[in-house]
UniProtKB/Swiss-Prot annotation:
Induction: By heat shock, salt stress, oxidative stress, glucose limitation and oxygen limitation. Mn(2+) 1 binds at residues 35, 66, 69. Ca(2+) binds at residues 57, 61, 220, 222, 224. It comes from Bacillus subtilis (strain 168). This is Manganese catalase. It holds the Pfam family Mn_catalase. Its EC number is 1.11.1.6. The gene is ydbD.
């Protein structure tokens, strides 16, 4: 069950309208690593968690907060689009250079959403459920969460550098702070799960069933041997085994040769040599 509080978690009010920045801000709303993605990712991970109540609550708490961030950013986008001086835009558009800049505004904001946010990226790509990860393996999922928060915070930081609007910066500063917390919480939870299950996912798969002679080899597929300069090659692997550097990649299989396709699929016939 969800309950909507009719107040934002943090203010979302720009100093002035800016339809072009509204377009840019769509990325942290409906882009691959935007707030819609992390909210849905955490929700489905939480709903699918079995027998780990403290992690389920952690996921649901964070997911619910992210829904509030969706609301904040959508509100900010709408406010960046409202009160735009249309008469001034029309006059400015008579200049071909300025007109081309104004043409960079997201037309969806005017045509589709009526000066409101859309569930899409800054380039108009619709949000997709294919962006989310919810595997049922918490260690794998929490690593995906760490990546999502890292990419998301990076994009917010870049947006912060693109504006001088104090109201926008104020909200972005809050989002940066919350992403700092979320990165830290996933790092801490990952460390806890690694102590229980080991660092390799899934930790429940029998080692005897994998070809262990290849399990810790760093294979050089490049010219030169610069990849051998990794300091960690001289240390134990995170799972306690020893790393091995292979200077030159070797082949262990045969040349792949396929049978001709059956006539009914109408493939190109094999050439005669």
């Amino acid at each position: 069950m969800f309950k909507h509080t009719k107040m934002l978690q943090h203010p979302a009010k720009p100093d002035r309208p800016d339809p072009l920045f509204a377009k840019k801000m769509q990325e942290i709303l409906g882009g691959q690593f935007g707030e819609i993605s992390v909210a849905m990712q955490y929700l489905f991970q939480g709903w699918n968690t079995r027998g780990n109540e403290k992690y389920k609550d952690l996921l649901m708490d964070t997911a619910t907060e992210e829904l509030g961030h969706v609301e904040m950013i959508a509100t900010m986008i709408a406010r960046l689009l409202e009160d735009a001086p249309l008469d001034q835009q029309e006059k400015a558009a008579e200049d071909p250079v300025i007109g081309s800049i104004l043409g960079g505004m997201n037309p969806h904001h005017a045509i589709v959403s009526g000066l409101g946010a859309m569930p899409e990226s800054s380039t108009g790509v619709p949000w997709s459920g294919g962006y989310i990860v919810a595997s049922g393996n918490l260690l794998a999922d929490f690593r995906a969460n760490l990546n999502a928060e890292s990419q998301g915070r990076l994009q917010v930081a870049r947006l912060f550098e693109m504006t001088d609007d104090k109201g926008v910066k104020d909200m972005l500063s809050f989002l940066l702070a919350r992403d700092t917390m979320h990165q830290n919480q996933w790092l801490a939870a990952i460390k806890e799960l690694e102590a229980q299950e080991g660092p390799v996912v899934p930790g429940t798969f029998p080692k005897a069933l994998e070809k262990q002679e290849f399990s810790h080899q760093l294979i050089n597929f490049s010219e030169g041997e610069v990849s051998a300069e990794q300091n960690w090659l001289n240390e134990k692997a995170p799972d306690g085994e020893a790393f091995e550097y292979v200077k030159e990649a070797k082949t262990f299989g045969e040349k792949p040769e396929l049978k001709p396709a059956p006539p009914f699929v109408h493939n190109t016939l094999p050439g005669r040599e």
